[in-house]
């Protein structure tokens, strides 16, 4: 049985999954409780194994962390990651497809949640009111729409080469999932960026732009991501931005990408995305 835990300020829950032949045994609930369980049957063992991988990929994407059987990392959990841009083909792996989870509607209430009711006022705490502006520069004035989205298209394009030195990227401290994401992002550096890229990949490119370029003002980047990809996509990018940090050895053009449990300092300039 493989166990996964999700924890944030509001919840602490588990998900466990195990394949037994052509069956998938699943359990979930709050940590410390028995939770609920379900058995799904498939046509054969291969189909069950594929479904297990999809379920695990979905939960990891949502922030679940697998719990090892002991406190030491398994051999398969470590990968050396000091690479030149040209060496990335050895690390990029096929991503498992994402399967959306469907939930039955809550039968205990037919009421609309108050913050979803039409035309209802949203009341903010006094300590954050000064940041809840419709636009960070001019309250009430919408962000100007760009025609060709130049900041987005050329995102992080100057990172791989600087002063005739090819950048070296070290992301070995990241999890396997993030190592794969970072490798995909680096492979896209010299191409034109669009919001068809997965949001974690876009987050890495945005982090590289903000941390490893000479120009620190990048407000237009997020405006253009929102314009093309929508607010939900941009929000997902911001969430993933807070999961990584970057250290840059400018003299040697070595870029180290690290996991981060809190919002890194380079996000401070974007504290008012709204």
UniProtKB/Swiss-Prot annotation:
Pfam families: WGR (PF05406)
PROSITE patterns xref list: WGR
SUPFAM superfamilies: WGR domain-like
CDD domains: WGR_MMR_like (cd07996)
Domain WGR: residue ranges: 2-78
Protein name: Protein YehF
Species annotation: Escherichia coli (strain K12)
Induction text: Repressed by LexA, induced by DNA damage.
Function according to Swiss-Prot or TrEMBL: Has been implicated in selenate reduction; a mini-Tn10 insertion mutant in 'molR', (which was mapped to 47.3 centisomes i.e. this locus), is defective in the reduction of selenate.
Gene coding for it: yehF
InterPro entries to which the protein is assigned, alphabetical: LolB (IPR050458), WGR_dom_sf (IPR036930), WGR_domain (IPR008893), YehF/YfeS-like_WGR (IPR049809)
């Amino acid at each position: 049985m493989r166990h996964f835990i999700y924890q944030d300020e509001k919840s602490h829950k588990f998900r466990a999954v195990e394949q037994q032949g052509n069956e998938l045994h699943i359990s979930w609930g709050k940590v410390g409780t028995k939770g609920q369980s379900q058995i799904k049957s498939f046509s054969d063992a291969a189909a069950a194994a594929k479904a297990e991988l999809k379920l695990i990929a979905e939960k990891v994407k949502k922030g679940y962390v697998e719990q090892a059987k002991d406190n030491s990392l398994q051999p398969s959990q470590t990968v050396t990651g000091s690479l030149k841009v040209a060496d990335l083909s050895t690390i990029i792996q096929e991503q498992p497809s994402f399967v959306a989870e469907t939930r039955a509607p809550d039968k205990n209430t037919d009421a609309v949640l108050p913050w979803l009711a039409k035309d209802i006022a949203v009341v903010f705490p006094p300590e954050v009111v000064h940041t809840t502006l419709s636009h960070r520069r001019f309250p009430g004035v919408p962000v100007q729409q760009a025609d060709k989205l130049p900041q987005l298209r050329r995102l992080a394009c100057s990172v791989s080469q600087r002063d005739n030195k090819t950048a070296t990227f070290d992301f070995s401290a990241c999890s396997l999932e993030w190592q794969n994401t970072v490798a995909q992002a680096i492979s896209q550096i010299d191409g034109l960026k669009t919001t068809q890229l997965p949001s974690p990949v876009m987050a890495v490119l945005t982090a590289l732009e903000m941390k490893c370029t000479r120009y620190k003002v990048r407000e237009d980047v997020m405006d253009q991501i929102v314009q093309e990809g929508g607010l939900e996509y941009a929000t997902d990018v911001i969430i993933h931005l807070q999961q990584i940090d970057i250290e840059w050895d400018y003299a040697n053009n070595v870029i180290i990408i690290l996991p981060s449990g809190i919002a890194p300092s380079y996000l401070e300039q974007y504290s008012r995305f709204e």
